[in-house]
Regions:
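Conserved C-terminal portion of the radical SAM core fold
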Residues: 1-65, 77-101
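Generic, ordered loop/turn and secondary-structure boundary motif
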Residues: 18, 60-61, 65-68, 158, ...
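General structural signal for secondary-structure boundaries
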Residues: 22-23, 74-75, 171-174
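Short glycine-enriched, charge-decorated loop/helix-capping segments at active-site entrances
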Residues: 68-74
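Radical SAM enzyme core and accessory elements
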Residues: 88-174
């Protein structure tokens, strides 16, 4: 409220979707908060020139974190959640930005991968996957093709829950 009273008209909110135990109700809470902020601005300033940006990344389970054993949501489920949130926030004063679900999936595969992925990475590089951290160069289909050619199932790295007693590829790192 103080920010609006002092002339601020733009707010950016950061969230993560796809966390373990997340429900659609949690996503609805994101929409509700964004709408409430816009309404609060109108109450305080009497104008409708507020801009709320909601930036939502996808959960990527990473080694050495409490969630390292948890699966990542499938690409289809992340895309469903993104669409659900978009449908809830249909307001010209609120903009939703999303991390690409397919990029997040590849991040999870590589983050929890083992030495076998070296074959995939080399093959992808040879096929031109060099600037894939840039959205305009990322080619998901080419990466999936490389996984298939190497006979490696990327879902085993990203979407599989891991047993806490399982030997992890990163366990040797101290």
């Amino acid at each position: 409220a103080n920010a609006f009273k002092n002339g601020w008209s733009k707010v950016k909110l950061y969230f993560m979707m796809g966390l373990p135990t997340e429900t659609d109700e949690d996503l609805a809470g994101i929409a509700s908060l964004a709408l409430r902020i816009k309404d609060l601005y109108h109450e305080i300033r009497g104008k409708y020139d507020c801009r709320v940006t909601v930036s939502v990344s996808s959960f990527v389970p990473k080694p050495f974190t409490p969630f390292q054993w948890m699966p990542q949501c499938s690409v289809a489920e992340i895309e469903r959640k993104q669409q659900y949130l978009k449908d809830l926030v249909r307001d010209k004063h609120i903009k939703c930005d999303y991390h690409d679900a397919k990029t997040g999936y590849l991040e999870a595969v590589l983050a929890r991968g083992d030495r076998q992925l070296g074959k995939v990475i080399l093959k992808a590089w040879k096929k031109g996957c060099t600037y894939d951290s840039w959205t305009e160069f990322f080619n998901y289909d080419k990466w999936i093709e490389c996984f298939h050619e190497c006979n490696i199932d990327p879902d085993l790295y990203a979407n599989r829950p891991r047993d806490e007693f399982e030997q992890e590829p990163w366990d040797h790192i101290d």
